């Protein structure tokens, strides 16, 4: 005769097995370095009308988000610098959830759902901005 709790254990195991595919589909996507390097990294260096480049305020700053300083004469980062920037940017995102990722909320206008506490410029007037969408794609696990 099985112990009294055996039925509960079997039922719990069956429920866990049934939920496993759903739980797996909700797993956070991995952030892709190659997508970051090709599509996200240029955004940090890009001059936008009426705004300074992200790089200007965030190069080795005391901000929560800092970027590597460009080497003298360089127009972009080295591989090593890019990997450090990737790690730094990754800290400020919740993979799979652009709406709660600081990297996307800080430069977004408050009227569009951005964080009102960002002291820097509002790079994106809305979530329809092509560069905001690129950042969101990266956070959602987009790959090249």
Task: Show where each model-derived region lies.
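N-terminal secretory signal peptides that target proteins for export/translocation
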Residues: 1-3
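Residues at the start of alpha-helices and the adjacent loop-to-helix junctions
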Residues: 5-10, 99
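Aromatic- and Gly/Pro-enriched helix-to-coil junctions and flexible linker segments
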Residues: 19-144
């Amino acid at each position: 005769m099985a112990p009294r709790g055996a039925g509960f254990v079997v039922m719990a195991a069956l429920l866990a097995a049934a939920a496993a595919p759903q739980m797996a589909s909700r797993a956070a996507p991995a952030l892709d370095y190659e997508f970051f390097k090709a599509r996200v990294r240029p955004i940090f260096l890009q001059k936008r009308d009426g705004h300074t480049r992200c790089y200007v305020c965030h190069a080795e700053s005391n901000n929560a988000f800092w970027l590597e300083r460009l080497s003298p004469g360089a127009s972009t980062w080295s591989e090593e610098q890019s990997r450090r920037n990737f790690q730094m940017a990754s800290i400020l995102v919740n993979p799979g959830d652009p709406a709660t990722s600081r990297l996307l909320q800080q430069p977004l206008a408050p009227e569009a759902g951005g964080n009102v506490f960002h002291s820097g410029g509002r790079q994106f007037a809305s979530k329809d901005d092509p560069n905001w969408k690129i950042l969101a794609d990266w956070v959602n696990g987009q790959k090249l």
